Design a protein with these regions (language model features):
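Nucleic-acid substrate recognition interfaces
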Residues: 1-365
Length: 365
């Protein structure tokens, strides 16, 4: 069976390459906006859909010939996908890309080995040739490169290399190495073995520093050089928080996937929960959704089970010893006291035990 996996690296282009990369960012944005504009105009005039090609724009815009043609073709595909997602009610109507606000990126495809790693320190790309690469994680030889996305984040350049590979995943035989995880606002999760993730809460740790930077930004003249410099500082701190969170979650999900043969969690509506309970910052800080995605694909590649149980299952209200279900349990009550069997147990630990038990029933372990 075929699978896809992306590898992200930092690259170090020279001045000429950096100039061409930034020129490609601009050309891709220009092509996207032009195709979107003509599509909107044609629909208003005729009531029909029409997506023009990047090739039709090159005669009047000679600068488009200087950059990677596949990057321009992918911009056209992005317009098509934007309309498809809109008509299928998965996204809002496509918007034009701003030079200042939009993410600077472009995607190019591998054709006839046009994209490859050389000497474990260079990445060969169309038009750009050899770029210095921080090759900290090796791509297996049986993985075929499909495409590369270049991005600029706070002045640093990165590539995300999408690969395709074939793998026959051997399912791990059933045994008792099952763990249940109950979502915790402050600690990420509490497990059925009464382990706590002890998530460092990076955003909360640096929130005061962010406030100071944002306060300083508010005092500067908008769109001035100093305003942009201050905005860059804020952006870099946000990126640092994001990278710390991602690193922590990768290591934690790897440890769990290697230790257990099945992981059971609740299928929670995190976005709705954060809006309803005004816990947006705390929910966003711990990255629960990102953690589950990491855990799912790592378990899958190892032939292990990842199970989401119904979000309406009363894991917190149910007694893990006798099965009694409470009519009501306030969020402020941090321990579970059962009226039937008399057990008193940590609320989150009790919920994790229930999640594990229902998961074992479903998986027939």
């Amino acid at each position: 069976m075929k699978y896809n996996l992306a590898f992200k690296y930092r690259i170090y282009p020279n001045k000429e390459q950096e100039l061409l990369i930034n020129k490609t960012f601009g050309c891709v944005r220009f092509v996207y906006n032009t195709i979107l504009y003509t599509a909107n105009k044609f629909y208003e005039e005729t009531g029909k859909n029409k997506i023009i090609t990047p090739a039709s724009l090159k005669s009047e815009n000679q600068f488009l010939k200087e950059v990677d043609s596949l990057a321009l073709s992918n911009a056209q595909l992005n317009v098509k996908w934007s309309f498809t997602n809109f008509f299928q009610k998965r996204a809002k109507f496509p918007k034009f890309k701003s030079k200042k606000k939009s993410v600077k990126s472009y995607t190019t495809n591998c054709v006839n080995n046009s994209i490859r790693i050389e000497e474990n320190k260079y990445l060969v790309l169309p038009k750009l040739k050899r770029i210095k690469l921080k090759y900290h994680r090796e791509i297996p030889k049986n993985y075929r490169i499909k495409s590369v996305t270049l991005t600029n984040s706070n002045g640093n350049y990165y590539v995300s290399i999408l690969t395709e590979f074939e793998k026959e995943i051997q399912k791990v035989t059933s045994n008792d190495k099952v763990i249940g995880l109950d979502f915790s606002m402050s600690e990420l999760f509490v497990s059925s073995e009464n382990q706590r993730a002890d998530y460092p809460r990076y955003f909360r740790m640096l929130e005061e520093e962010l406030k100071k930077l944002q306060k300083s930004l508010s005092r500067k003249v908008k769109f001035s050089k100093n305003w942009y410099k201050q905005k860059m500082k804020i952006s870099k701190l946000h990126e640092y928080i994001k990278n710390c969170r991602r690193d922590f979650l990768h290591k934690l999900s790897k440890k769990l996937s290697e230790t257990y043969n099945a992981v059971v969690v609740e299928d929670l509506n995190i976005r709705g929960m954060s809006q309803a309970l005004n816990f947006g910052k705390s929910v966003g800080d711990n990255g629960w959704g990102m953690f589950l995605r990491m855990l799912e694909y790592k378990l899958m590649f190892l032939g292990k089970q990842f199970l989401k149980i119904d979000k309406w299952f009363p894991s917190s209200k149910t007694c893990s010893r006798c099965g009694n279900v409470k009519d009501e349990l306030k969020l402020s009550e941090r321990s579970y006291k059962c009226e039937c069997c008399g057990i008193e147990i940590d609320r989150d630990y009790n919920a994790a035990l229930n999640i594990k038990n229902i998961g074992k029933e479903i998986l027939k372990y």
